[in-house]
Amino acid sequence: MNIFSHANLGTTEERGDDAKRTILAGTDIVGDILKTTLGPKGMLKMLKGQHVNVTNDGAFILNNLMIDSPSARILIGSSTGQDWEEGDGTTSVAILASLLVKEAGKLEMHPTKILRGYRMAQAKCEEILSSISFEATKEDLLKLVRTTLCSKVLRYDLERFCEICVNAVEKLEGRNDLNLIQIIKCSGKLEDSYLDDGFLLKKDIRIDDVVNPRVLIANTSMDQDKIKVFGAKINVNSVGELEEMEKAEKIKIKGKVERISQNGVNVFVNRQLVYDYPLQLLRMKGIQAIEHADFDGVERLNNVLGGKILSTFDNMDESCYGTCESIRNVHVGNERMIKFSGVRSGASTIVLCGSSKEMLDEAERSVHDALCVLAKIKEDPRVIYGGGSSEMAMAVGLNKYAMEVPGAESDAILAFSSALQQIPKILADNGGYNGESIKASLRAEHNSGRTSYGVNVRNGSIGCMKEAGVVDSLRIKHRVVTAASETAQMIIKCDAIVKCKPRERTRE
């Protein structure tokens, strides 16, 4: 089918230089927006929409942008993928990809040769990263979290939050299920934040303390009058018939309570409301009911207590019940919550205190990034030095590698190297220093073999990142380079932009 036929008058196409300019403009927009947020001295962005958000989280910024450019949307998708896979490095992916596309635009050669050179450069970068990596110690884990959080809002109380994040992950005892770590937000001062053992359920209800409880978690209706609840209508001939219906409903709900109370259950957590009559029956059985718990809380509670979320109570066995050491009321800030202590799997709760909703939301995103980095380092414990040292090490290695490669591909490898060298320059620029001068000095140090040297944003100089304690995860850095390179190659290979006519909608 010819999409440019007279039947598709709404279809438009850009080719040649016009298409390349449009594609480059889209990637430049994303790169320019994000590059000022990179590093410890990165700036914040104020996002205005339904709510105002202040953040420097790359994935959050990109997901809230309204951009029509197709090349920009590809970068956003790549950054979002980085967030899903690794939890950190989202800003670096988008910036590096935009720089690679920009450097490729300066080369006057066929895109196929550029792509071949970029693939060769990508493979060489993977070799260089592996050669400069080393196994992380427990001290390196703290350094890794510091590097992650130093560019976030939590940098003002860095040591406290580093300790909170490391302890929370260590409690998992080798498991990488971050769903076992809950984050609760409340009003207060940031320095009042802490790590609490156990699980906190956000439910303002008073309960008696229970030791070694037997918990049944459910998502089931606990009302005996569905006619009133659903607004249905029935026709009866007498009040007696209505009374018989009421009795039948009560008998039904009583049977449900009997099934709930079997096998020694003393705490019942329900996703839905528990009405007065079943609540009375549960109390008579010595069962404490927690009703209308939020869905996310019920899912997490089921994970940490064990058992199952039930909707019916037939054929129950031991696997249906959860347990912990104790349940009691606690106050977090100005809110009353229910604490489940001594839960399995090393679950814990991070309580974040802040003066505003915007501060709490940004703190939550920062803690999530740090937890993701720590979880991934358990899978691959290798780390590298940060501060732009790894990017410059790859760039210098590519410069030497390009001298060995014949043909036009060497120019593409040098372009890849040039893009990598922009990362330490951006780090220095964001600190208010002379980025070009620092980049040149850092390149000279790496040419002399000092591969651990990077940008010291505290004093605007270059220094040893080993002494400064700045480390990055090898796994995350490897994926940043891979994702940015593959995204850039996809964009470079495009030679036209086709905008199709929207499908016509008709009433049938």
Curated annotation (Swiss-Prot):
Keywords: ATP-binding, Chaperone, Cytoplasm, Nucleotide-binding. Pfam families: Cpn60_TCP1 (PF00118). InterPro entries: Chap_CCT_beta (IPR012716), Chaperone_TCP-1 (IPR017998), Chaperonin_TCP-1_CS (IPR002194), Cpn60/GroEL/TCP-1 (IPR002423), GroEL-like_apical_dom_sf (IPR027409), GROEL-like_equatorial_sf (IPR027413), TCP-1-like_intermed_sf (IPR027410). One of its GO terms (cellular component) is chaperonin-containing T-complex. GO terms for molecular function: ATP binding; ATP hydrolysis activity; ATP-dependent protein folding chaperone; unfolded protein binding. Its main location: cytoplasm. It is found in: Cytoplasm. Molecular chaperone; assists the folding of proteins upon ATP hydrolysis. Belongs to the TCP-1 chaperonin family. NCBIfam families: chap_CCT_beta (TIGR02341). Component of the T-complex protein 1 (TCP1) complex. This is T-complex protein 1 subunit beta. The gene is CCT2.
